[in-house]
């Protein structure tokens, strides 16, 4: 029991130091306590959490995930799966056990604001990266 408490204390201390040292990790949604040694997806790189866009211009979001087997990425906007259409493009590139995806909305409108999610899934689990978008005039 004491060794489990020490491990938990060390993990919390490491997270605290990481947040204090690296400003990019200061958002709680960027912290990842998942054990990825079993091959479950890991979000390795992504756009920043908060994204502002100008109405009528382009919004670009990026998400990269690795795992074994290689994860599949699905994008959601306000809880609904994003499907490519006249102003939404989704691109993928694959390198070994890593998949990268770009979501592009061009031109943007008021309805494009809100929460987006990049969901990486394989047989061993899922990982979600959230983005919050808002428009400017």
From Swiss-Prot:
Disruption phenotype: Viable with locomotory defects which may be attributed to impaired GABAergic motor neuron function. Hypersensitive to the drug aldicarb which may be indicative of abnormal GABAergic signaling. Premature postsynaptic remodeling/formation of DD GABAergic motor neurons in animals at larval stage L1 with remodeling/formation occurring 8-16 hours posthatching as opposed to 14-18 hours posthatching in wild-type animals.
Subcellular location: Membrane; Secreted, Extracellular space; Cell projection, Dendrite; Cell projection, Axon
CDD domains reported in the protein's UniProt record: Ig (cd00096)
Domain of life: Eukaryota
Location, primary (coarse class): membrane
Domain Ig-like C2-type: start-end pairs: 41-133
N-terminal signal peptide: 1-23
UniProt keyword terms in alphabetical order: Cell projection, Disulfide bond, Immunoglobulin domain, Membrane, Neurogenesis, Secreted, Signal
Gene Ontology biological process: neuron remodeling
Disulfide bonds: 63-118
InterPro entries to which the protein is assigned, alphabetical: Cell_Adh-Cytoskel_Orgn, Ig-like_dom, Ig-like_dom_sf, Ig-like_fold, Ig_I-set, Ig_sub2
GO CC entries: axon; dendrite; extracellular region; membrane
Gene3D superfamilies according to UniProt: Immunoglobulins
Tissue note: Expressed in DD and VD GABAergic motor neurons. Expressed in a subset of head neurons including M2 motor neurons in the pharynx. Expressed in coelomocytes.
Matching PANTHER family: CONTACTIN 5 (PTHR45080), IG-LIKE DOMAIN-CONTAINING PROTEIN (PTHR45080:SF8)
Functional summary from the UniProt entry: Plays a role in neural development, where it temporally regulates synapse formation in the D-type inhibitory GABAergic motor neurons, dorsal D (DD) and ventral D (VD) motor neurons. Controls the translocation of postsynaptic proteins, such as the acetylcholine receptor subunit acr-12, and presynaptic proteins, such as snb-1, along nerve cords to prevent premature synapse remodeling/formation.
Protein name, entry field: Immunoglobulin domain-containing protein oig-1
Species assigned in the record: Caenorhabditis elegans
